[in-house]
UniProtKB/Swiss-Prot annotation:
Gly residues: compositionally biased ranges: 602-614
Family as reported in the entry's similarity comment: Belongs to the heat shock protein 70 family.
Record's compositionally biased regions (Low complexity): 615-624
NCBIfam families for the chain: PRK00290.1 (NF001413), PRK05183.1 (NF003520), prok_dnaK (TIGR02350)
Modified residues (Phosphothreonine): T197
PANTHER family: HEAT SHOCK PROTEIN 70KDA
Top-level taxon: Bacteria
Annotated protein name in UniProt: Chaperone protein DnaK
Organism: Phocaeicola vulgatus (strain ATCC 8482 / DSM 1447 / JCM 5826 / CCUG 4940 / NBRC 14291 / NCTC 11154) (Bacteroides vulgatus)
Primary gene name: dnaK
Induction cue: By stress conditions e.g. heat shock.
Amino acid sequence: MGKIIGIDLGTTNSCVSVFEGNEPVVIANSEGKRTTPSIVAFVDGGERKVGDPAKRQAITNPQRTIFSIKRFMGETWDQVQKETARVPYKVVKGDNNTPRVDIDGRLYTPQEISAMILQKMKKTAEDYLGQEVTEAVITVPAYFSDSQRQATKEAGQIAGLEVKRIVNEPTAAALAYGLDKAHKDMKIAVFDLGGGTFDISILEFGGGVFEVLSTNGDTHLGGDDFDQVIIDWLVQEFKNDEGADLTKDPMAMQRLKEAAEKAKIELSSSTSTEINLPYIMPVDGMPKHLVKTLTRAKFEALAHNLIQACLEPCKKAMSDAGLSNSDIDEVILVGGSSRIPAVQELVEKFFGKTPSKGVNPDEVVAVGAAVQGAVLTDEIKGVVLLDVTPLSMGIETLGGVMTKLIDANTTIPARKSETFSTAADNQTEVTIHVLQGERPMAAQNKSIGQFNLTGIAPARRGVPQIEVTFDIDANGILKVSAKDKATGKEQAIRIEASSGLSKEEIEKMKAEAEANAEADKKEREKIDKLNQADSMIFSTENQLKELGDKLPADKKAPIEAALQKLKDAHKAQDLSAIDTAMAELNTAFQAASAEMYAQSGAQGGAQAGPGAGAGQQANQGSSNNKEDIQDADFEEVK
């Protein structure tokens, strides 16, 4: 059985881990970083960049650089108006009332953008493991709705991954933290404040069983919001000083976003920071600079409401778990925003104990996902995970009331049936409107899908018996069925409404993603081949200079001819011609080396061929070959 990787698909950063050698390993990406920015950029020529390369070019390409896409996952157009107003890229209303990202007229679903990030994580794992990866455990915020979970699973499918399990982020963090403590009896609180979401989960573990007692949170509260209060403050300060509105300039706003994020991070270890943005915007034809000092106290005042917003979910989670603060043995901080000192003070004050610093807030969720993957493949035995559904689920009944079938914090998998009847005489059809939330009226909750049960035998109101069954799987994804007990007619739906994607659309997007991955691979191979040729040209020219008159004229001529052929092929970027020219050059140089070796005897040894710096064999006739040496290409930074 292949490896199941663990992926933390974050709002700001993503991370991938795998269980290997009896422990989880966080895998560094191709840039050498253990976390990857959840950013996708579309650049000229149709090229796509993901992660750090995308982040580096964001300032000069703000309208085609996509970040914080997780905030749009599984949401309707109406639910993302606040987010749409914040981002510099264009978000439009698409099919089924869903948000789509418009890049040069091509509309991308949030799932497709997320899939591009997942492909990067998949490739990172494959490069490390040296084998194809097809299965993953992906984490989501504990308070994600059914449609948001479904959208995450779809993103995995588009990326070419079979999602074996969707795991709540705080639960994954608890798994990572408690793996070596699984046989202790402990109650822990996981406080997870990430880039876009906030979760609080209360768990109990002992005897290898990890049980979630309750969870609460806010899927629109996170580091992005803390950045935004700094951005808003800077915009207002500049308006007061210069009378100009920075929000009209997308490039300036992108610079503000980066500066705000940097300032927020610096204020976790310093009491003040300087924000210095020269030439931020021209005013009346004159370039203006933005220079401001932001103190930690001012930042905490700006973010006061956001910090306090973390409190109510904590109270609710403790109440739902039936515990008092003194019952909690340990508090675990997860997510980059949990590093904010005022947030840590709030947590310490609420729980009455200093939070544990024993886990890496940026990596622990991915590590927990890898642990869950190892549990599924039996690499880890004796560990049982009992998670819960974060929100109540039910249907709309007479009078627009929400009737709950499954309550929040019910252990999953879960199944519940209830019998309903018709609201009018001779009614032959009923609409099952599925809802998720905690409010009493249907309109106040989130609609996650609806379907019709037809063919009901005509009868007086209240006589037909319609059995509605809710079935939630281990991923927290819901299936609903309705059955007329009299006729035996049944209708079922796997809730996919808010994601708005059919199986056919997912398959089409998957094919496009694979095609793009293949195109990216070919582009990389092309660059590698050009670099290899460049290296061979450089090493050949150097060796021709070094050898000088020692090289016989009849051997030098074919080398120079092959070298010129390689230069021409390199200039034309003709990969086939490059291969041919490199082979000819190698043959010519080896012939010269063999003759020189014969002339010099054992004293001088063999000269290396031109490809030594490009991973080619130096001298196939020599018995003293060491391992290949790779030349590094350096680019001078001006």
